[in-house]
């Protein structure tokens, strides 16, 4: 008889199906985490300036995260001990995979909407607004994601980011799709490109 494999030895998709309830969110911010959600923990930035939310894995577990996906590279001994919890699942190169994982979790919303990315040094906000308004006038229910917030044009909610991080972006795209949008005009900052925030997003 074969010994039972530990949960984190199973393929990621099976782990999520087994441990996470439908409707749960994925987030990299413990402040937004609700019991049952999935936490994504990975460092972002470079040697000069780096934000590492793996420091909040214990907080995520105490808040009732169903699963914590974490980047195993460079993990301190203290965090390695915390990650012995069966809910913690290592994912190599998570910063670049987070968007793809979250997109799959939310039903790949960008595959069934027209998503237009706007990048550049200046003018992203204005251009994204104009594009969304023009599509709206062509009877294509449109939304925008950017500096002013995210949502359908008549209900834009602040997010605090020009381009939200990968899990939040996929969550927003899923919500916008469920609200009836068929098109999205999205600001794409240089930081977003550098940090892989739009990975998993199909751009037209």
Show where each model-derived region lies.
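N-terminal leader/targeting and accessory segments in enzymes
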Residues: 1-100
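Phosphate-binding loop of NTP-binding sites
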Residues: 97-204
């Amino acid at each position: 008889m074969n010994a039972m494999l530990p949960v984190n030895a199973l393929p990621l998709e099976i782990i999520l199906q087994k441990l996470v309830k439908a409707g749960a969110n994925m987030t990299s911010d413990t402040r937004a985490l609700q019991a049952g959600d999935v936490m994504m923990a990975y460092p972002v930035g470079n040697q000069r300036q780096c934000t590492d939310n793996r420091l909040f894995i214990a907080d995520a577990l105490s808040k009732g995260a169903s699963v914590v996906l974490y980047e195993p590279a460079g993990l301190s001994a203290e965090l390695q001990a915390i990650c012995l919890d069966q809910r913690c699942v290592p994912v190599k190169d998570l910063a670049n995979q987070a968007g793809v994982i979250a997109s799959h979790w939310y039903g790949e919303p960008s595959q069934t909407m027209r998503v237009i990315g706007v990048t550049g040094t200046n003018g992203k906000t204005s251009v994204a607004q104009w594009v969304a308004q023009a599509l709206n006038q062509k009877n294509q229910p449109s939304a925008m994601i950017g500096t002013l917030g995210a949502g359908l044009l008549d209900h834009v909610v602040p997010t605090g980011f020009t381009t939200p991080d990968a899990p939040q972006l996929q969550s927003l795209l899923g919500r916008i799709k469920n609200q009836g949008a068929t098109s999205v005009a999205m600001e794409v900052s240089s930081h977003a490109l550098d940090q892989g925030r739009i990975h998993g997003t199909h751009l037209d």
